[in-house]
Amino acid sequence: MHDIKLIRDNPDAFDAGLAMRGLPAQSATLIELDASRREALGKQQDAETERNALSKQIGKAKASGDEAEFNRLRSEVDRLKAVLEESGQQARHFDEVLNQHLAALPNLPHADVPQGADEADNVEERRWGEPRTMAFTPRDHVDLGESLGQMDFKKAAEISGSRFVALRGGLARLERALAQFMLDLHTTEHGYEEVSPPYMVRDEAVFGTGQLPKFAEDLFRTTDDHWLIPTAEVPLTNLARETIHAEADLPMRMTAYTPCFRSEAGSAGRDTRGMIRLHQFQKVEMVSIVTPDESDAELERMTGCAEKVLQLLELPYRVMKLCTGDMGFAARRTYDLEVWMPSQDCYREISSCSTCGDFQARRMDARFRKEGEKRPAFLHTLNGSGVAVGRALVAVLENHQNEDGSITIPAALRPYMGGVERIEG
């Protein structure tokens, strides 16, 4: 959410930020709506002040027995009452329209974000690891999983429809091992607090993180008007909502392992084979709540935490700085981690780490008070996948496959697999 005062003070800078997103100028419309709202509020306040003054005079007129003056004053109060009602309705109308406009606008990009239209314009920052040279043609994760008899898309489709999977045996255990490994790493080495959050949230929560109102079609809604979480970012970030936090309590770093639910409404025909794009998938999420001064450094730190997961899993990856046309709605700056997929001979996204500045905090009214200062300020929020468990499983299968179809378990996961070194059919 954007601050209308900042837009009034810096309309050209605001429009320039929108232009980086490929959007037309909006400041003039927003400022006009705000002016109409403030004019209505001014009329309401003036009428309220005048009515209060007349009310005192009515009492005096009644006490003195001046019936004509009493009736005149009462008639004037009735007129002011109508003005109050009309101006109040106008103020509420303009406030609602203004907030609808503001809520539909994405965050403005950081000055460091490269200009671009889509993922083709993203900028590679660095790489880690070399893709393994295999003496055989690598198989994709679907072929590997089905050959092991432990990945069942057919039965999952009979139960739930397309874009679902049932994992069994060693692969089900591998999925659990990956999540436990990631949680242990983030909590014991990276300083995150583990949270077990709700999987269903209210409108206010998904509005706060920016999925509503613009992306409702990407979500699943229950019959009692809850939303299934598309990511643990939603409940974790909202733990800071409607609170003034002490500076001494910051940063807050939280992590959670949850299922995520997405309709993939805009992904028809994309990644229809396999586990890359499912309606339900598992993910370990990281969320940081920080002061504005810490925001940029925290993004680098968070990205490094996600990178450590991939390094310990011995998975080659690259870090991409997203361009203005590929960033998420609430993001101010984003790094994507893309892991090597041998069967596709390319890198695929496995983690996305973003700083949102105060964009989400304004929507949630999440603030902090600096030591020694009376007036609170808005927090900065960050989120990142640490990492997507399903895609990590896919990457482990493909990068650690053997010619006979077995999977070598990375050393970091073996303690979580009861010492098992291979998954075999």
Swiss-Prot record:
Pathway: Aminoacyl-tRNA biosynthesis; selenocysteinyl-tRNA(Sec) biosynthesis; L-seryl-tRNA(Sec) from L-serine and tRNA(Sec): step 1/1. ATP binds at residues 262-264, 349-352. It is found in: Cytoplasm. One of its GO terms (cellular component) is cytoplasm. Its EC number is 6.1.1.11. Catalyzes the attachment of serine to tRNA(Ser). Is also able to aminoacylate tRNA(Sec) with serine, to form the misacylated tRNA L-seryl-tRNA(Sec), which will be further converted into selenocysteinyl-tRNA(Sec). Consists of two distinct domains, a catalytic core and a N-terminal extension that is involved in tRNA binding. This is Serine--tRNA ligase. It comes from Maricaulis maris (strain MCS10) (Caulobacter maris). The lineage of its organism: Bacteria, Pseudomonadati, Pseudomonadota, Alphaproteobacteria, Maricaulales.
